[in-house]
């Protein structure tokens, strides 16, 4: 897919993967599902769900490294800054030939890398982020989208990046 095609599909993901309500129990269900998907596939990832800057779910699976928690934080910061997936922000920067520094951000606190996705609640907006780190950025993004689609009962083939 081209950058434009990916951005179009991600926009559809961000419009579709929204909750009517999201609480700590929902965070647990989503986090546990991500854990199970990653474990079944032997993926060495860190998984984080944060609401209103409060961490509500975190696990690092075998193979994840201490660096993954820092990547999680920096990717999540991109989502909470722009209220869009970190992969969409990364692709937009790439398309524009810009870096995060061109937008006044620092690499120490923000990562232009896919894998973090906004948690949207209908009628409210972005209330947090769900983040995966440990795979190539497109795969991190796809894993999060898969878990969100399954949690919300949406068909994955209509949403996933190919």
Curated annotation (Swiss-Prot):
What residue ranges carry the coiled-coil annotation? none
Q: List the disulfide bonds.
A: none
Specify the superkingdom: Bacteria
- Transmembrane parts of this sequence: none
The record's listing under InterPro entries reads: PduO/GlcC-like (IPR005624), PduO/GlcC-like_sf (IPR038084), YBR137W-like (IPR010371)
Give the family per the record.
Belongs to the UPF0303 family.
Q: What is the name of the protein in this document?
A: UPF0303 protein Arad_3071
Q: Which organism is it from?
A: Rhizobium rhizogenes (strain K84 / ATCC BAA-868)
């Amino acid at each position: 897919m081209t950058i434009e095609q990916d951005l179009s599909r991600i926009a559809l993901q961000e419009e579709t993967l929204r909750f009517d309500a999201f609480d700590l129990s929902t965070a647990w269900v989503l986090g546990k599902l991500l854990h199970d998907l990653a474990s079944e596939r032997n993926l060495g990832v860190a998984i984080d769900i944060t609401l209103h800057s409060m961490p509500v779910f975190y696990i690092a699976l075998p193979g994840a490294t201490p660096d993954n928690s820092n990547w999680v934080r920096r990717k999540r910061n991109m989502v909470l800054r722009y209220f869009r997936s970190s992969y969409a922000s990364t692709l937009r920067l790439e398309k524009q030939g810009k870096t995060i520094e061109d937008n006044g951000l620092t690499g120490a606190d923000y990562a232009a890398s896919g894998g973090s996705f906004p948690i949207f609640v209908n009628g409210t907006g972005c209330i947090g982020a769900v983040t995966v780190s440990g795979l190539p950025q497109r795969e991190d993004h796809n894993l999060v989208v898969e878990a969100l689609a399954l949690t919300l009962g949406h068909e994955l083939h209509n949403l996933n990046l190919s």
